[in-house]
Regions:
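Short, small/hydrophobic-residue-rich motifs at membrane-helix boundaries and re-entrant hairpins
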Residues: 23-81, 98-157, 162, 172, ...
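Juxtamembrane/interface motifs at transmembrane-helix termini
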Residues: 41-45, 231-233, 240-244
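Interfacial aromatic "cap" segments that immediately flank transmembrane helices
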Residues: 2-33, 90-115, 183-236, 273, ...
Length: 277
């Protein structure tokens, strides 16, 4: 399939069965509510021990729903690979198992990303530069206050320290963003491999996932990512503008649209992978 066909099919797919999308929407909203509830209630355990239990229960429920949703995403990816136009049904056991496998893949890629970013942080010495900047500011304030140095010398010293910190921070952020983009694409390929082979071992083969991306076409994959980002950015901009005038209506549309886009992206992953399946 070409890029236009993939984008069109993916973003129309959730609307092909509104009843199943409604179930997915309710699950997504419930998960969000329980995450927010658990996050807000749990810290209050400092004042009332019962809040620890309540917050923990909320978060566990959110985790269970998250497993189920992730497993359903796997079925949507599989429908794209098989070019099946029917929106998948919800199956309790299969969705939970799929969600567990997707979670393993997510943790696997998170560990790799965290390691690479940690190396980047050490290489750029961003924390060391941050500490050095704070120390330099305190030192120069002391020097100026007790007239050890002039204000000009203090400003120059602080400026150099701040500059070094900003450069190291900028490099670290750039590396983190690039790593996140690359491994997000690799993770999507691994999820597609899982949907296609039903093998977690095959899905975790990062080198084969990379080969799959090359077979699909790196340019094609990057264009799909870029188009999705553009679509989301345009919609987000429109929402931000309209929110000032119609906050309630925009909030409702946002709640409906975020799960819709999430489902469309899973379909897009499957369709892109269908070329080599």
């Amino acid at each position: 399939m070409n890029i236009t066909e993939i984008i069109k099919d993916a973003f129309l797919f959730p609307s092909k069965n509104m009843e199943r999308f409604a179930v997915y929407l309710v699950l997504s909203v419930l998960m969000t509510v329980f995450i927010l509830g658990g996050t807000l209630v749990y810290p209050w355990g400092f004042f009332n021990v019962d809040n620890y239990a309540i917050g923990g229960i909320y978060l566990v429920i959110a985790l269970v729903i998250g497993f189920f949703i992730s497993g359903y995403h796997l079925k949507v990816i599989k429908s794209g690979i098989e070019l099946d136009d029917e929106v998948p049904v919800f199956e309790l056991g299969e969705n939970f198992l799929g969600g567990f496998e997707i979670t393993i893949i997510s943790v696997f890629y998170f560990i790799i990303q965290a390691f690479i970013i940690a190396v980047a942080v050490l290489a750029t010495n961003v924390f060391g530069n941050a500490i050095a900047t704070v120390q330099e500011i305190r030192l120069q304030i002391f020097n100026v206050f007790f007239m050890v140095n002039s204000a000009d010398i203090a400003v120059d010293a602080i400026s150099n320290a701040v500059f070094n910190f900003i450069i190291s921070l900028a490099i670290t952020i750039a590396v983190a963003l690039i790593v996140f983009l690359i491994f997000s694409i690799l993770q999507s390929a691994s999820q597609a491999r899982l949907a296609n082979t039903d093998s977690l071992k095959d899905a975790l083969d990062i080198f084969e996932a990379l080969k799959d991306i090359k077979r699909i076409g790196i340019v094609k994959v990057l264009l799909l990512v870029l188009l999705v980002l553009v679509i989301i950015s345009v919609m987000a901009t429109i929402f931000i503008i309209l929110f000032n005038y119609l906050p309630l209506a925009v909030s409702v549309i946002y709640i409906l649209l975020v799960p819709y886009i999430a489902l469309a992206i899973q379909r897009l992953i499957g369709l892109a992978y269908s070329d080599i399946a």
